[in-house]
């Protein structure tokens, strides 16, 4: 399981809820989690804020 999905599930957040929090579509977030699209830094910043992490933690582990 990838890091983003693991974080999301650990925090009991659905894919749709996460996409809404980040400000992107459900499909786009799903594609990022499944490595069909690249995770851009500006999205990593938003995701990191949700989980109270640093953006680099999203890319390199927490």
Task: Kindly label every feature range from the protein language model.
Residues 5, 30-31, 59:
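Key DNA-contacting residues within the recognition helix of helix-turn-helix
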Residues 1-10:
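A short, Lys/Arg-rich alpha-helix, primarily the initiator
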Residues 13-31:
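Short alpha-helical DNA-recognition segment
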Residues 34:
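Short, conserved catalytic or interaction motifs in soluble domains
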């Amino acid at each position: 399981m990838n890091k983003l999905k693991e974080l999301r599930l650990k925090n009991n957040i659905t894919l749709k809820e996460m996409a809404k929090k980040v400000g992107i579509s459900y499909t786009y977030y799903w594609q990022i989690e499944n490595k069909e699209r690249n995770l851009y830094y500006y999205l990593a910043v938003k995701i990191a804020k949700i989980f109270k992490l640093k953006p680099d933690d999203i890319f390199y582990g927490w």
